[in-house]
Amino acid sequence: MPYVLVTCIPVWLVAAITGDSSYIKAIDKIWENIVGKKIYITGGIGARHAGEAFGDNYELPNLTAYNETCAAIGNVYMNYRLFLLHGDSKYFDVLERTLYNGLISGVSLDGGKFFYPNPLSCDGKYHFNADHTITRQPWFGCACCPSNISRFIPSLPGYVYAVKDNQVYVNLFLSNRAELKLNEKKVVLEQETGYPWNGDIRVKVAQGNLPFTMNIRIPGWVRGSVLPSDLYSYADDLKLGYRVLVNGEEVTGELRKGYLRIDRKWKKGDVVEVHFDMQPRVVKANEKVVADRGRVAVERGPIVYCAEWADNDFNIQNIILNRHPKFQVTEKPELLYGINEITTEVQALGFDAAGKLATRDVTLTLIPYYAWAHRGEGKMDVWLPVNRIDVE
């Protein structure tokens, strides 16, 4: 894990307890540097294997990315503590991106095998894992990642809501039932959702008749922000929207630190419905990220997608993505424990019978990044070429 995270943990605690502005400024500067220059689109951090370290600013290689699973968990911890310190949804935007991509990619879908690093590209040859493999393993000599992720997953319910005085923050969208205390009075919320596969969320007040403010996080990806920095941006012209209704009546208002505030006297049976527009988006990296020049990534909601060999009968690293691609989203409940698959038309490069370079139109299939490497060894890419010069 990048050791700056370990070093900063007591600093966050001291800053929160004492309110010392010098500590807070230092922490904020570290966070700004990470999110603005050193984080992967998957939320992974720590580019270098050597020293388990951050690299220079904008040093974000894909094939050799380290992105230790423990560092992703540390990134969640860091952003959660900074949310508690500042009350800003941007920290949960980073936390959510990390959770759904660069963190759970570190464990197999059946929970029995683990990655140490989490690269964004695989050529089927470079042995990136801690034991010089390219598949998840049941254990490692240094077993911090398996034990750390096994500890983290059961703690996830504690990140869904936050409470301060008479305010409830709805930070993550997961089906759940939660008992919360607001000034010693109990409120029970029930959340139903198909998120992250769709953007429909239903929060019901199952118990509690009292006034309080419900703060609904409106994710950055809905509002046109990949991350709260200029490290990544959307390369398409889509404008996503959202709607929030209370008992069937639409609620509007300005966002405060990324939250829509609903202040009212709540009663048992009240229902909040949230609808996020969720479509595939094309993402580009800052030009200073050399590894991603001439390439784009695809995401939908908080999920980053990748191309993997198992779904495509051509070399996925010899393709050209259209500059204005059209996407098809298909539910695949039987595939990889249930996913949404994305397809689009691309050009595959190869050689014709005369040995000349030629292209052919093919359908490219994309799967969620976290689900890769479950069907054998082979190639994978998150960042896809849009120029012939950038093809392998």
What is each of the regions a protein language model found here?
Residues 1-6, 44-68, 111-140:
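Carbohydrate-binding/catalytic loop surfaces
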Residues 4, 64-72, 84, 142, ...:
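Aromatic-acidic/polar surface patches that form glycan- and anion
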Residues 6-21, 26, 59, 63, ...:
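Well-ordered alpha-helical scaffold segments within catalytic/enzyme domains
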Residues 16, 32-36, 84, 104:
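Amphipathic alpha-helical segments of tetratricopeptide repeats
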Residues 22-37:
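Carboxylate/His-rich catalytic cores and anion/metal-binding grooves
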Residues 27, 93-101, 106-209, 223-246, ...:
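C-terminal beta-rich recognition modules with glycine/proline-rich loops and embedded aromatic residues
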Residues 83-92, 262:
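Carbohydrate-binding surfaces of carbohydrate-active enzymes
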